[in-house]
Each structure stands twice: as C-alpha cells, then as structure tokens.
Amino acid sequence: MDIIEKIKDTREAKGLSRYKLSQLTGIHESTLKRYEDRAIKKISFENLLKICEALEINIKEII
C-alpha cells in the first residue's frame, strides 16, 4: 500500500470527506482529489505534514 492509499483509507476510516479534510488542512479540495486520483504524482512534504496532522496520524505510519 502506498502513501496515497494510506491517506485515503485513513480519511475514509475516520469518516472525513475530501471537503472536510480540505477545511482542516487548507489544501484545496480539488488538489486532494487529484492526489487520490493520481493526477498529481508527488505530494509535497508540507502538504503531507498538513494531512497527517489533520488525520491525527504520525507521518511514520504512512511512509
């Protein structure tokens, strides 16, 4: 399982929509969708940290 899959699985397991995650992170919802759809191949470290914080997970859990 790769980083994007882990993020999506965790987001869904916590019952968060992409819209809500967008609100929590400040990352535009369309950017989150493009990450999950793999339209954007690489996620910035800064955005990865924001997502992990919003999902309340340690970055070590997904990398």
Question: How should each PLM-predicted stretch be described?
Answer:
Residues 7, 21, 32-35, 62:
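Conserved hydrophobic/aromatic packing and binding residues within compact polymer-binding modules
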Residues 5-24:
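Short basic helix-loop element that most often maps to the first helix and adjoining turn
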Residues 27-42:
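Recognition helix of helix-turn-helix/homeodomain-like DNA-binding domains
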Residues 46-61:
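DNA major-groove recognition helix of helix-turn-helix/homeodomain DNA-binding modules
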Residues 1-2:
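A detector for short, charged/polar N-terminal pre-domain segments
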Residues 8-12, 36, 58:
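A broad helix-preferring feature
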Residues 5, 29, 44-48:
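Short alpha-helical elements of helix-turn-helix
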